[in-house]
């Protein structure tokens, strides 16, 4: 039976075109069913331009409101009760969809997901995990990249557990280290004593876990392929992510400018074109889809606001893989197994349950 993915069709900068085209690509390549959530008339018009909606495994669910990129997250989440984000996440909570994908306002997406779905038992704070390429042709993940600006050491310990589970399950067969992912803490030095109070205390907690913990990892080693799961607070993670995105863009432009300087270089480029195509693809964020919010009672993925159809297609793919590998069930088991060491018997997850009903 196909996995059903609810897509916020009004989320991206150029919505709904990337969402609709990405959904159409996804149903052609993967065994999935897609629910497009948004303004019904707009979606029917755009979808009808591509194919007859009734002949596709695509359903449209109406949502009268849209949370824009300029909306303040906290206010929009509370006031726009019929937003495409909120309606899509409700579909997951009600079992009508297996996962939710949005390329909309990141802050609003994270806040809405926490409110509508709630956290898994034992999870204090869900974390946003970003997948990035390494020089060894394997992927790695960084979390948190923005869901929690301020963290406690036990939060980073839980991030390590959730990130390790995600990598071990979803990257099985894709990475030589999937059976025993190497977990590290992003810090300013490799020694246990380096870093601030948060990273030093987190180090003590993470090393007590039955994980392949490699210790502290410096920022310069982010892409060298020597670590599979890198843990940090959301402030540091988001800064690292944005710097990486900016660096990739700069390198591309510098390379393009350099290759155009002489005829000899242009000829060299033509002779090596396939290598450059491969290089570009490895650095293309759209190939990695969306970032999962780990630790929720449901699967939710957040993509880049500038997502194109390929990014949406791949976000649907990774969301389906997440569901297929039962990542949430695995996270719940590992968190429960470590609960005594974590000391989180009074999880904030209980406080979040039913929060939407009170909103």
Curated annotation (Swiss-Prot):
A Pfam family it matches: FA_synthesis
Highest taxon listed in the record's lineage: Bacteria
Protein location: Cytoplasm
GO cellular component, one term: cytoplasm
Reaction it catalyzes: a fatty acyl-[ACP] + phosphate = an acyl phosphate + holo-[ACP]
Metabolic or biological pathway: Lipid metabolism; phospholipid metabolism
Keywords recorded for this protein, A-Z: Cytoplasm, Lipid biosynthesis, Lipid metabolism, Phospholipid biosynthesis, Phospholipid metabolism, Transferase
Listed InterPro entries: FA_synthesis, Phospholipid_synth_PlsX-like
A single GO molecular function term of this UniProt record: phosphate:acyl-[acyl carrier protein] acyltransferase activity
Predominant localisation class: cytoplasm
Enzyme Commission number, as recorded: 2.3.1.274
Known partners and oligomeric status: Homodimer. Probably interacts with PlsY.
Reported function: Catalyzes the reversible formation of acyl-phosphate (acyl-PO(4)) from acyl-[acyl-carrier-protein] (acyl-ACP). This enzyme utilizes acyl-ACP as fatty acyl donor, but not acyl-CoA.
PANTHER family in alphabetical order: FATTY ACID/PHOSPHOLIPID SYNTHESIS PROTEIN PLSX, PHOSPHATE ACYLTRANSFERASE
Protein name, entry field: Phosphate acyltransferase
Source species of the chain: Koribacter versatilis (strain Ellin345)
């Amino acid at each position: 039976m196909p996995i059903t993915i609810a897509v916020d069709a009004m989320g991206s900068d150029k919505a709904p075109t990337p969402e609709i085209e990405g959904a159409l690509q996804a149903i052609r390549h993967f065994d999935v069913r897609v629910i497009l959530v948004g303004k019904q008339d707009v979606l029917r018009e755009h979808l009808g331009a591509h194919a007859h909606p009734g002949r596709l495994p695509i359903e449209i669910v109406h949502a009268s409101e849209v949370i824009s990129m300029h909306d303040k997250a906290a206010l929009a989440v509370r006031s726009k009760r019929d937003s495409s984000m909120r309606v899509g996440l409700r579909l997951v909570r009600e079992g009508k969809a297996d996962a939710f994908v949005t390329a909309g306002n990141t802050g609003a997406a994270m806040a809405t997901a926490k409110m509508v779905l709630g956290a898994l038992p034992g999870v204090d704070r869900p974390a946003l995990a970003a997948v990035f390429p390494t020089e060894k042709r394997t992927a790695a993940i960084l979390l948190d990249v923005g869901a929690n600006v301020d963290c406690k050491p036990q939060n980073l310990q839980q991030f390590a557990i959730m990130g390790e589970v995600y990598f071990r399950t979803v990257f099985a067969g894709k990475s030589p280290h999937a059976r025993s992912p190497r977990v590290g803490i992003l810090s300013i030095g490799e020694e246990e004593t380096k870093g601030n109070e948060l990273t030093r205390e987190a180090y003590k907690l993470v090393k007590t876990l039955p994980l392949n913990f490699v210790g502290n990892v410096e920022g310069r080693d982010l892409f060298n392929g020597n670590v599979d799961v890198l843990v940090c607070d959301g402030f540091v993670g988001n800064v690292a992510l944005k710097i990486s995105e900016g660096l990739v863009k700069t390198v591309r432009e510098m390379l393009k400018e350099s290759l155009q300087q002489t005829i000899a270089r242009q000829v060299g480029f033509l002779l090596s074109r396939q290598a450059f195509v491969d290089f570009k693809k490895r650095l293309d964020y759209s190939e990695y889809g969306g970032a999962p919010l780990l630790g929720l009672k449901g699967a939710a993925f957040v993509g880049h606001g500038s997502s194109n159809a390929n990014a949406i297609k791949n976000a649907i793919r990774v969301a389906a893989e997440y569901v297929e590998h039962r990542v949430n069930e695995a996270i719940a088991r590992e968190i429960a197994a470590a609960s005594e060491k974590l000391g989180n018997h009074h999880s904030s997850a209980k406080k979040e349950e039913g929060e939407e009903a009170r909103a």
